[in-house]
Amino acid sequence: MVNRTSPMDGGAEDSPPEGHKWLKVNGVVVGTVPITGDPEMDLIVAREFLDKRGLRPPPPTKLQSMFRQAIAFATVSRDCHEMLNRQPRNPVYAAPFVVNIAFSIELYLKTLAEAHGVTPWGHDLMKLYEGLPGAALAALSKVTPHVAQSEGLAETSDVGDALANLRTAFVDWRYLYEKESTEMVHIPSAIFVARALHEACLASGIK
């Protein structure tokens, strides 16, 4: 392990040795590796360094990868929503918001189903929802009232009802410029669904 104040780095706390870069695991510096100038080779060198020291984190499971990707698309949709709310309003962010939140919902639904032993397919959100096993629906129903209330909606708000408005949104809104019109999306309901599914995934033990 390389100490940030060791002679190796010339005494500079924030600078690695010349021609090297810091290597971190979970935000902690564990050493330095040479910069080869080739990104792929740099990755190989870093992996070898970590493997030799038993520091390389285990790869995520399929379920973890699905959940993290759902979170990533939900995060992008949140950023688009923030842009939509800025003044003066710019409606150009509406389509990216809908596409990203719809896809995040699709991934959350598939993640939740996978966590309970079902591997679903397709983009139709209602079909994915209707295909959830009982245990997944139970996990979702437990978190729904609290999430609805936190989003300013009635505690009796239903995920299925909200999904009826979103079922083909991912497909319909990707090429919005090619259409004269498309079904409007109720933004608060879309956010409610994404958050409820996120919480249901957490409640199902997915991290």
What kind of region is each of these model predictions?
Residues 91-103:
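Alpha-helical scaffold segments that form or flank carboxylate-/histidine-based iron centers
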